[in-house]
């Protein structure tokens, strides 16, 4: 089963993707994690991606699809995957469909995590990130030692500053929301999930929604 996660920044897609991947026994493939690894290693892709990420802008489709093509062709994704951050625009949805078609695969379902703007801004503005492992944390002040004890310090990422948050939400509304309509018109089930509340409750809502989606693998 190949599942695309959609939703605005701060909706908790990353956390829910990990929990659902464990339940389904398939990997979560997050473009954000791939980009951060590339940035950490200062690869040409990482340097290019960082310019966009620091501004809170979307990384170009050519970069995203190149990474996804390799990830989806890997043995790890042979029985499916949960894609987080892979599709944010209609051209990306179209590009992903072509990439999957080339390996005789398709998107089986879309989970759309919803939350109001006030909650999203509250979540994002209170988030700090380890400058080494790039793991985000809530309720920790900048300068605090990373809870993972990797020697890193928590920082406020540029794209988690108020101005960048507003920019990211505006981009989502303008470019990402139409992706929902695209998938619906192409016959892909789109399940809306209330992302407000306890993490476990949100996971249960998503798992319940997936019960009615046929598994391809």
State where each predicted segment sits.
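Glycine-rich phosphate-binding loop of ATP-dependent small-molecule kinases
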Residues: 1-217
């Amino acid at each position: 089963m190949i599942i695309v996660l959609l939703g605005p920044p701060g909706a908790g897609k990353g956390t829910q993707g990990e929990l659902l991947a464990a339940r389904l026994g398939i990997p979560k493939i997050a473009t954000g994690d791939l980009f951060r690894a590339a940035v950490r290693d200062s690869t040409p892709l990482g340097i290019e991606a960082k310019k966009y990420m620091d501004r809170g802008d979307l990384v170009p489709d050519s970069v995203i699809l190149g990474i996804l093509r390799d990830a989806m062709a890997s043995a790890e994704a042979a029985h499916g995957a949960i894609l987080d951050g892979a599709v944010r625009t209609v051209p990306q949805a179209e590009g992903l469909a072509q990439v999957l078609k080339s390996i005789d695969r398709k998107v089986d379902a879309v989970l759309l995590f919803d939350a109001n703007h006030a909650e999203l801004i509250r979540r994002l503005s209170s988030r700090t990130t380890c400058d080494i492992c790039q793991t985000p944390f809530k309720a920790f002040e900048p300068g605090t030692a990373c809870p993972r004890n990797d020697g890193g310090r928590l920082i406020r990422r540029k794209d988690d500053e108020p101005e960048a948050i507003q920019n990211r939400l505006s981009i989502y509304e303008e470019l990402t929301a139409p992706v929902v309509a695209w998938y619906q018109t192409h016959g892909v089930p789109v399940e809306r999930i209330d992302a407000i509340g306890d993490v476990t409750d949100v996971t249960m809502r998503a798992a319940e929604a997936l019960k009615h989606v046929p598994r391809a693998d």
